[in-house]
Curated annotation (Swiss-Prot):
InterPro entries: Ald_DH/histidinol_DH, Ald_DH_C, Ald_DH_N, Aldehyde_DH_dom, G-glutamylP_reductase_CS, Glu-5-SA_DH, GPR_dom
Function statement: Catalyzes the NADPH-dependent reduction of L-glutamate 5-phosphate into L-glutamate 5-semialdehyde and phosphate. The product spontaneously undergoes cyclization to form 1-pyrroline-5-carboxylate.
Organism of origin: Haemophilus influenzae (strain 86-028NP)
Name of the molecule in the record: Gamma-glutamyl phosphate reductase
One of the record's GO molecular function terms: glutamate-5-semialdehyde dehydrogenase activity
Length: 417
């Protein structure tokens, strides 16, 4: 099954690599239109996944990741249209020149080929990845979680029908719909056809791919994100940033998980924060100084464990740690962070610069919410993943991250001397 799927994807990638930008944009436009026209059918299939999730006792955070609404579907269609508006990186000349030998040489962006994406309970990823791969001339094999089987099946049907309407091979976008986990292992070994594996999910999925794949793997997505409130920060504004970073959509990987507060302002700042978040159902996890302050402020708080400081909650749980100064904050991030997104709230330009220079993360923020680490927010269009590694791509992966390059050398029957 996967051998045939891989060959079909490779053949489709050969065709996609030769398409003009206009041809690719035409297909994307049809996909966006079909997402809207087929919305009732898509939402009906998604409702089946939601009902099964509830029956199986999945968490509210996971169900939120599964859920498609009319508004979310419209947003997904808009993301596809935004990808249409973005510059096509394929064929772009990165650099070049003429050598002493007379050979003209250029480095030109090219598609990667075939992308394999393994993801968990996020049906929106199906469209995000498909649209970015199509724009960059890549074929894609998708493997969603069993929790999204109905949603993914209908979304793939919509995309493949749109491809055929555009006169393109439907096998440019394929999905493994069988929930058998052995097929994941087979996909990870399909290096004859697949050029890159991109996992989107928890740490367990990323570890599985790293350990078993014979194909290069993009690692990332696990976000134990921190925000450090330094003593010079505007406390009232800081509270709104923390509210946004924690409560806007807690299930995402760019959500704040651990709040670091400088010791000298903790007794003043934390009660204000608790009061502001009183209606948001935030559960705090803290120890020593922070634990005592939060208890006195009437917060729903329990003692934090070492394991929880490394945990991506994906919920309204929030770790709170009081630190002595910026050095202690940076050291805490070095010990517990996942190199995803880290933020400092401060009025000091010098301390902001120190934080930027010393914190090792894909995205570092000054006086802003970590929720901005997103392909759409960064102007990249729908992202295929957020990479926390340093090779090939880092941070939100947009169009350029799905390309490689080739050296194009032109001579006049030139030979090497």
């Amino acid at each position: 099954m996967l051998e045939q799927m891989g060959k079909q994807a490779k053949d489709a990638a050969f065709i996609l690599a030769q398409l003009t930008t206009a041809e690719k944009n035409c297909a994307l436009s049809i996909i966006a239109e079909q997402l809207q026209q087929q919305a009732p059918l898509i939402l009906a299939e998604n409702a089946k996944d939601i009902e099964l999730a509830k029956q199986n006792g999945l968490s509210d955070a996971l169900i939120d990741r599964l859920l498609l609404t009319q508004e979310r579907l419209q947003s997904i269609a808009n993301d596809v249209r935004h990808v249409i508006s973005l510059a096509d990186p394929v064929g772009k000349i990165i650099d070049g020149g003429t050598l002493d030998s007379g050979l003209k040489i250029e480095r030109v962006r090219t598609p990667l080929g075939v992308i394999g994406t393994i993801y968990e309970a996020r049906p929106n990823v199906t469209i995000d990845v498909a649209s970015l791969c199509l724009k960059t001339g890549n074929a894609v094999i998708l493997r969603g979680g069993k929790e999204t089987q109905f949603s993914n099946k209908i979304l793939i049907e919509v995309v493949q029908n749109a491809l055929e309407q555009a006169g393109l091979p439907k096998f440019a976008v394929q999905a493994i719909t069988d929930p058998n986990r052995e097929l994941v292992m087979q996909l990870l070994k399909l290096d004859r056809y697949v050029d890159m594996i991109i996992p989107r999910g928890g740490s367990g999925l990323h570890e599985l791919c790293k350990q078993h794949s014979t194909i290069p793997v993009i690692v990332g997505g696990v976000g134990v994100c921190h925000t450090f409130v330094e003593k010079s920060a505007d406390q009232n504004k800081a509270i709104f940033v923390i509210d946004n970073a924690k409560t806007q959509r807690p299930s995402t990987c760019n959500t704040l998980e651990t709040l670091l507060v400088q010791h000298s302002i903790a007794e003043e700042f934390l009660p204000k924060l608790v009061s502001h978040l009183a209606t948001k159902n935030v559960k705090y996890h803290a120890k020593s100084t922070a634990l005592n302050i939060l208890k006195q402020a009437g917060a729903n708080v329990c003692e934090v464990t070492e394991k929880e400081l490394r945990k991506e909650w994906g919920s309204l749980d929030l770790n709170v740690v009081v630190v002595e100064d910026i050095h202690a904050a940076i050291e805490h991030i070095r010990q517990y962070g996942t190199q995803h997104s880290e933020s400092i709230l401060t009025s000091s330009q010098n301390l902001a610069r120190q934080f930027i220079n010393q914190v090792d993360a894909a995205a570092v923020y000054v006086n802003a919410s970590t929720r901005f680490t997103d392909g759409g927010q960064f102007g990249l269009g729908a992202e295929v993943a957020v990479s926390t590694q340093k090779l090939h791509a880092r941070g939100p992966m947009g169009l350029e991250a799905l390309t490689s390059y080739k050296w194009v050398c032109e001579g006049e029957y030139t030979v090497r001397k």
